[in-house]
Amino acid sequence: MARIAGVDLPRGKRVDIALTYIYGIGRTTALQILDVTGVDWSRNIDDLSADEVNEIRKELEQNHKVEGDLRREISSNIKRLMDIGCYRGLRHRRGLPVHGQRTHTNARTRKGPRRGAVGKKK
């Protein structure tokens, strides 16, 4: 089992699919990495030699932010928005949609479960 960027890649999967198990790597980026390293995308992860795995690992470390570094950067960007008090930061702080979606109806995922209306006592 190959271990790249702290993630155990699944055995028996194609290399391009297995790379998508790494946070921050999608199909397009996986194919770009394989093109740069010269590894055939249709091969199984089990069939890769140690040199090929090391080359993929080296390419990821040099040219891509993945896993913890990427998560840290995203959270620091959101924290920066909240600290400077811009509109997007306020929306993050209040737990509302950030990109201009309507909130009168919908936005339940972002807002959480509905609060029940207070009923009239009999």
UniProtKB/Swiss-Prot annotation:
One of its GO terms (biological process) is translation. One of its GO terms (cellular component) is small ribosomal subunit. Residues 95-122 are annotated as: Disordered. One of its GO terms (molecular function) is structural constituent of ribosome. Keywords: Ribonucleoprotein, Ribosomal protein, RNA-binding, rRNA-binding, tRNA-binding. The keyword RNA-binding applies. Gene3D superfamilies: 1.10.8.50, 30s ribosomal protein s13, domain 2 (4.10.910.10). InterPro entries: Rbsml_uS13_C, Ribosomal_uS13, Ribosomal_uS13-like_H2TH, Ribosomal_uS13_bac-type, Ribosomal_uS13_CS. The keyword Glycoprotein does not apply. Part of the 30S ribosomal subunit. Forms a loose heterodimer with protein S19. Forms two bridges to the 50S subunit in the 70S ribosome. Belongs to the universal ribosomal protein uS13 family. Located at the top of the head of the 30S subunit, it contacts several helices of the 16S rRNA. In the 70S ribosome it contacts the 23S rRNA (bridge B1a) and protein L5 of the 50S subunit (bridge B1b), connecting the 2 subunits; these bridges are implicated in subunit movement. Contacts the tRNAs in the A and P-sites. This is Small ribosomal subunit protein uS13. It comes from Nitratidesulfovibrio vulgaris (strain DSM 19637 / Miyazaki F) (Desulfovibrio vulgaris).
